[in-house]
Amino acid sequence: MRNACRLTMMGFILCGALALAQNPPAPTRSPILEQVAKTYGVDSWDKVEAIRYTWNGEIVGLFKVAHKWEWEPKTGKVSYDGPDKDGKPVKVSYDSSQLSGQSDQVKNQVEPSFVNDNYWTLFPFHGYWDKSASAIDQGKFNLPVGPGMAELVPVKYPAGGGYTPGDVWDLYVGKDNRVVYFVYNRGGAKPPSRVFATWTGYKKAGPILFSTEHRGTADGKPLHIFISDVAVKLTGSDKWIDAQ
C-alpha cells in the first residue's frame, strides 16, 4: 500500500483494490452481493447524475477529520473540500479517469482519500462491481459485538495490486439484505490491521440507500465514522435530493 493510503490528509484509509492482478482466475462470488446491491439501489444507479456527502472520521487519540465530496459518476469529475496531509485547507476538482495528468497532491493524497471515503459510503455497490474480489456466503453467524445473527459474506480482494492488496471485508447481512455490521482485515502490514464497525443510520436519497453511521474500534481504539450532508442529483434535474 502506498504511504499516501495510510492516513492520507489525516483520513482513515480502507481502500479497495483498484489495480488488480492481470488475468486472475475468476473468483467465486455469492449471489447475495447482487441482492445486497439491489437493496441499496444499484438498479437505479444509471439515473444518478451526482452524489455529494461529507465523510467524517475519528479514531480517539489519532485523528479527527471531515472531507466534503461531490462526485459525478458518469463524467468521473470529483470535487474535494477539506484538509491536506498537514491540515491546510484544500479545494480542488479533477477528472478521476485522467489521474496521470493531475498534480502529485491529487494523485497521492486526494484521490486515495476519495477512494477510501467512497468505499465507506457505497461499499454495497463496490463489493458488487469489483468482480476480481471473491465473495462466499458462509451462512449465519453471531454478530461480532452485541446480540443477533446475520449472514457472513467475506469480500476478499486479490493479493496483487491496488492500494491495499489482500484486504478482506467481512459483511454481516441481515434478513432485509442490509449490511448490519462489518469487520475489515487489512491485507498489508500498515495499521490499522483490523476494524470492527456497525452499519446503522440508514437514510435514502432518491433511489439510493446509505448507511450513515459507523461505530466500533480500529485496532482496539474507539472509532466513529459518519456520513453527513448526503444528497443525490438525478439525470435531467438540477435539484439535489437530501437523504432522509
For the regions a language model picked out, list residue spans one by one.
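Bacterial N-terminal signal peptides that target proteins for export
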Residues: 1-10
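Short amphipathic beta-strand/extended segments with alternating polar/hydrophobic composition
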Residues: 66-71, 89-97, 106-116, 195-198, ...
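Gly/Pro-enriched, hydrophobic low-complexity segments
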Residues: 21, 146-243
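Flexible, processing/modification-adjacent segments and terminal tails
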Residues: 23-34, 94-167, 187-193, 243-244
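Tryptophan-centric aromatic hotspots in well-structured domains and transmembrane helices
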Residues: 45, 69-73, 120-121, 169, ...
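Hydrophobic h-region of N-terminal signal peptides that target proteins for export
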Residues: 12-21
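N-terminal mature ectodomain segment of secretory-pathway/periplasmic proteins
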Residues: 31-105, 133-142
